[in-house]
Amino acid sequence: MVLDSGTQVYEQAPPSPPASSPSQHHKLKPSNRNGPPLYPWPQSLAMPLALAVPSALQHQTMWQTFSKLHLEQRSHMKRSESTYSVNSTGRRGRGKAPLGRGCDPGGGTLRPAASLPHIAKIRKDVVSGSNKSPCMLVALRPTNMDQEREKFFQSHYAYNPQFEYQEPMPMSVLEKYQEASGQFMHQAVGIIKAVLEKFGTYENFEAATGGQLLTKCQIWSIVRRYMQKEGCVGEVVVQLSEDLLSQAVMMVENSRPTLAINLTGARQYWLEGMLRHEIGTHYLRGVNNSRQPWHSTEGRQQYGLRPANPTEEGLASLHSVLFRKQPFLWRAALLYYTIHQAAHMSFRQLFQDLEQYVQDEDVRWEYCVRAKRGQTDTSLPGCFSKDQVYLDGILRILRHRQTIDFQLLTSLGKVSYEDVEQLRPHGVLDKTRVPHFMKDLDRYRQQLEHIMTTNRLDEAELGRLLPD
């Protein structure tokens, strides 16, 4: 996800402490779900560009090397909306779910396949001893969220949380995203209702579209095959853990792009979509962007580029559901709807309003917290509207899907589809990379048509909303 209209960057993970103080460094909780360690390499090898698979049966992290190639530091691979926080506490806040309702028999809470990205948990080593401002996602995560969640649920949803935040608050960001849009509310509600008409409930939808829960061996196999398809074997470290609150976290660690995947929520179809989203879209466009004369803020200003966020997130969101039999845009639609409603409702009103679409209280809590980010007194109407960019970007791309040069759009890096023709003569296209799923453009465009049909999007209506 992208914070601003400039170059998309990944958030740097905090510097690793000295080797002599291992207790100070937060470790990924190892997984014991799948028996003995898959890979016999000890952590002492410190091989770059590896697939890290923690195991409870061995104290050191196991590494499976994709390649021995060394990756140069890529400053363009810092994503501002990705989290670097990996925590084991506060997973649910109301105790463990009973077996059969959100729990894996092997341990760990299963998160729905399309639930929200985690709001980064604040780390003491980030807050203290640093003069730098915290990243947006940390600054906007309430420091007392677990306590307020407990109060909220104990009140039977009658209490409006009173959130506290780490200082300083990013006021310029809050002001930028304080207004919600209603431009695409009809489309958002239409998508949500289409899902519920077909599946009955959100929970049924997740069970049907998420696919089977994957073992470590299956995850590693899928990731390895995907990296081979994209020709980026050896470039991205992949870590498997049971200690993530999110489904996946993209970060830069020791100057290397690192993708951490949550074992307890890794499902077949979600994992494939996540790889197209994170690697096939964000990562490859970032690599291509680093080769272009507009890779810097100054370069973007020189070429007069439009904000890249809607295109970037629209593409990534479309790629998440690409090739699914039923590619519903549920998450983007519900985020858009939730933020619009939050602008006019208190927290408890919003929570109750979402019940018509989502019965799972934990999922509703996540959506409400994201929509109310930055608010102290949530009894007041107000929203943090940034997450509306997903549906906004999706619909803009679908509106112009027949005229967009998708391969060139990817090759030019972090740019809007509106700037492609302007930049065509200036792009450095030598050795740029296009994701494998975009090379057959006929098939790719057919999938976009399938997405239009499945989500009941009307061509004429999009034309009226987004005229040329």
UniProtKB/Swiss-Prot annotation:
Zn(2+) binds at H277, H282, E313. InterPro entries: MATCAP. Binds 1 zinc ion per subunit. It catalyses: C-terminal L-alpha-aminoacyl-L-glutamyl-L-glutamyl-L-tyrosyl-[tubulin] + H2O = C-terminal L-alpha-aminoacyl-L-glutamyl-L-glutamyl-[tubulin] + L-tyrosine; C-terminal L-alpha-aminoacyl-L-glutamyl-L-glutamyl-L-phenylalanyl-[tubulin] + H2O = C-terminal L-alpha-aminoacyl-L-glutamyl-L-glutamyl-[tubulin] + L-phenylalanine. Its main location: cytoplasm. Tyrosine carboxypeptidase that removes the C-terminal tyrosine residue of alpha-tubulin, thereby regulating microtubule dynamics and function. Also able to remove the C-terminal phenylalanine residue of alpha-tubulin TUBA8. Recognizes adjacent tubulin dimers along the same protofilament. Metalloprotease with an atypical HExxxH zinc-binding motif instead of HExxH, which interrupts the active site-containing helix without affecting the integrity of the catalytic site arrangement. The N-terminal disordered region enhances its anchoring on microtubules, while dampening processivity on the polymerized substrate. This is Microtubule-associated tyrosine carboxypeptidase 1. It comes from Rattus norvegicus (Rat).
